[in-house]
């Protein structure tokens, strides 16, 4: 084999190996990004559930406060 043939063969083997390695790295990054996305989605769902629970508590507390205010206003108007 001539020197130029060996050089071309070596270069093509090198480029092929680099391409295969690049594809594997890209796939690994994509899989990790997908896993991270699932974890973020689960965290968002948990946060949403917590926000809904807190909103429910706030609604209950607001109703209790309004009921107490009504009682206080009724007592105040009865005393005058």
From Swiss-Prot:
Presence of the UniProt keyword Phosphoprotein in the record: no
Where do the coiled-coil regions begin and end? Answer: none
Give the matching InterPro entries: Pet117
Enumerate the transmembrane spans: none
Q: Which GO terms describe its cellular component?
A: mitochondrion
Q: Which family does it belong to?
A: Belongs to the PET117 family.
Protein known as: Protein PET117 homolog, mitochondrial
């Amino acid at each position: 084999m001539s020197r130029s043939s060996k050089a071309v063969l070596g270069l093509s083997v090198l480029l092929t190996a680099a391409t295969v390695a690049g594809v594997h790295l890209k796939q690994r990054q994509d899989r990790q990004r997908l896993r991270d996305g699932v974890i973020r989605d689960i965290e968002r769902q948990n946060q949403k559930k917590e926000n809904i629970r807190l909103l429910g508590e706030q609604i209950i507390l607001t109703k209790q406060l309004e009921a107490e205010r009504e009682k206080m206003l009724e007592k105040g108007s009865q005393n005058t």
